[in-house]
Curated annotation (Swiss-Prot):
Self-association state and partner proteins as the record states: The 4 large subunits of the cytochrome b6-f complex are cytochrome b6, subunit IV (17 kDa polypeptide, PetD), cytochrome f and the Rieske protein, while the 4 small subunits are PetG, PetL, PetM and PetN. The complex functions as a dimer.
Keywords for this protein: Chloroplast, Electron transport, Membrane, Photosynthesis, Plastid, Thylakoid, Transmembrane, Transmembrane helix, Transport
Function: Component of the cytochrome b6-f complex, which mediates electron transfer between photosystem II (PSII) and photosystem I (PSI), cyclic electron flow around PSI, and state transitions.
Top-rank taxon, per record: Eukaryota
Presence of keyword Transmembrane: yes
Location in or out of the cell: Plastid, Chloroplast thylakoid membrane
Membrane-topology descriptor: Single-pass membrane protein
Record organism: Pinus thunbergii (Japanese black pine)
Protein name listed in UniProt: Cytochrome b6-f complex subunit 8
Gene encoding the protein: petN
UniProt-listed GO biological process terms: cytochrome complex assembly; photosynthesis
Length: 29
């Protein structure tokens, strides 16, 4: 468990989650 791997994993999760919120918000769901 290295800090870089954890940081990248967390960053990807946050990015994917925020992107999904934007998409759902624009589709009106």
């Amino acid at each position: 468990m290295d800090i870089v791997g954890i940081t990248w994993a967390a960053l990807m999760v946050v990015f994917t989650f925020s992107l999904s919120l934007v998409v759902w918000g624009r589709s009106g769901l």
